[in-house]
């Protein structure tokens, strides 16, 4: 489904939170949305492999990487795994790498920056916890909508159709 965050803000301005404009699109989908699962991990993406093994239909993985752009949390291998398991999208408060490969995949990916250095894979981090960045607090189960204009968040799903 295609989302227009500008239109959604016009319709639901009282019901949505708008994330500060820190992110760029790196995925093959220009818009995406779904119920979020939150993860907090700093320069380590080991936990993400297990999460992307889950069925991602209707889901978006929201990663709080502490805003670090020193190491990429998402690479082509992880994004392919997410695509295979039907994840709608990924939002990274941090960096990605292998951006040409990411752009070829049918998944939405928003991140702060790209860098060629990969993350560690110790599995250090937490999932399904409250995270805060971009002026918004995110909880697993909230609904996120993203396009090239921005990212918005709603406690409940928005009536799009």
UniProtKB/Swiss-Prot annotation:
GO molecular function, one term: enzyme binding
Annotated keywords: Cytoplasm
Gene3D superfamilies: Ribonuclease E inhibitor RraA/RraA-like
Cleaved signal peptide residues: none
CDD domains: RraA_family
GO biological process: negative regulation of RNA catabolic process
Cellular component annotations (GO), alphabetically ordered: cytosol
Recorded superkingdom: Bacteria
Main subcellular location: cytoplasm
Cellular localization per UniProt: Cytoplasm
Keyword Cytoplasm listed: yes
UniProt record similarity statement: Belongs to the RraA family.
Summary of the function given for this chain in its UniProt record: Globally modulates RNA abundance by binding to RNase E (Rne) and regulating its endonucleolytic activity. Can modulate Rne action in a substrate-dependent manner by altering the composition of the degradosome. Modulates RNA-binding and helicase activities of the degradosome.
PANTHER family: 4-HYDROXY-4-METHYL-2-OXOGLUTARATE ALDOLASE 3-RELATED (PTHR33254), REGULATOR OF RIBONUCLEASE ACTIVITY A (PTHR33254:SF29)
Subunit field text: Homotrimer. Binds to both RNA-binding sites in the C-terminal region of Rne and to RhlB.
HAMAP family: RraA
Protein name: Regulator of ribonuclease activity A
Taxonomic source organism: Pectobacterium atrosepticum (strain SCRI 1043 / ATCC BAA-672)
Name of the encoding gene: rraA
């Amino acid at each position: 489904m295609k989302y227009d965050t500008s239109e959604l803000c016009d319709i639901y301005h009282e019901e949505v939170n708008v994330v500060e404009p820190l992110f760029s699109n790196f995925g093959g989908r220009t818009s995406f949305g779904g119920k979020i699962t939150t993860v907090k991990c700093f320069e380590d993406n080991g936990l993400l492999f297990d999460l992307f093994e889950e069925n991602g239909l209707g889901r978006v993985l929201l990663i709080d990487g502490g805003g670090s752009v020193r190491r990429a949390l998402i690479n082509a291998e992880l994004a392919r795994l997410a695509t295979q398991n039907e994840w709608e999208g990924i939002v990274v408060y941090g960096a990605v790498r292998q951006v040409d490969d990411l752009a070829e995949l049918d998944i939405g990916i928003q991140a702060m920056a790209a860098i060629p250095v990969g993350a560690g894979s110790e599995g250090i981090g937490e999932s399904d916890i409250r995270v805060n960045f971009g002026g918004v607090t995110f909880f697993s189960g909230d609904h996120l909508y993203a396009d090239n204009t921005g990212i918005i968040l709603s406690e409940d799903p928005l009536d799009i159709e």
